[in-house]
Regions:
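Acidic/His metal-coordination segments adjacent to aromatic residues that form catalytic metal sites
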Residues: 1, 61-83, 134-142
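Bulky hydrophobic/aromatic packing residues
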Residues: 7-10, 70, 77, 92, ...
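Amphipathic alpha-helix face/heptad-repeat signature
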Residues: 4-5, 34, 88
Length: 189
């Protein structure tokens, strides 16, 4: 999965913020500190994992193989989204931003990710793309933007990857199509 390790980092950030202390980062996790585990996740995403998750060196966005997000599982078959899914980029941004509190290199990288989201995910008029479709090895700049409206783009706002008020309003307005009494659908009609 591309998202679960990043959710661990975001959940840790939320805990640190709620506790008002980063002491949990020194907790022992099988011989490594939690801090070391989180840094290891980021570094493996940067270098590339054995299962194909890798950072695009040009854009700093994360490539995700098919069937690696919550939405495109293979059993049963879901919505294939091989390439650069927007929620993975939002989680990646948040992970880097959190670790950037202690390591300036990660903060700088998070800013590159935010700039790439702005550059590549808003190519279609009136839309934030759900995914930039690409095969392994294809950079984000050559990926094909997806115009489907899905709730994944909301993470770009809630995790702080998109902060421009006009872009945030665009995402929220488009997501209104997904609202139903009591919740939000995963796909528009």
């Amino acid at each position: 999965t591309s998202d679960a390790p990043l959710y661990l980092i975001v959940a840790t950030r939320d805990y640190v913020d709620a506790a008002g202390s980063a002491a949990i980062l020194d907790a022992d996790c099988g011989g490594r500190t939690l801090r070391n585990v989180l840094v290891s996740i980021v570094e493996n995403y940067r270098r590339g994992t054995p299962n194909g998750i890798v950072m695009d060196s040009d854009s700093a966005l994360i490539f995700s193989p098919s069937h690696f997000t919550w939405m495109d599982t293979n059993f049963p078959a879901g919505t294939p989204r091989e390439g650069y899914p927007v929620e993975i980029q939002a989680l990646w941004f948040a992970a880097l931003d959190f670790l950037g509190r202690e390591e300036p290199e990660y903060r700088k990288l998070s800013r590159r990710v935010a700039a790439s989201i702005e550059q590549y995910f808003f190519q279609l008029p009136g839309r934030c793309s759900d995914c930039l479709h690409a095969r392994r090895g294809v950079p984000a700049r050559a990926a094909v933007p997806d115009d489907h409206i899905r709730p994944n783009q909301l993470l770009a706002v809630t995790l702080g990857a998109v902060t421009d008020p006009a872009r945030c309003r665009l995402i929220l307005t488009n997501s209104e199509e997904l609202l139903v009494p009591g919740g939000i659908r995963s796909l528009a009609d």
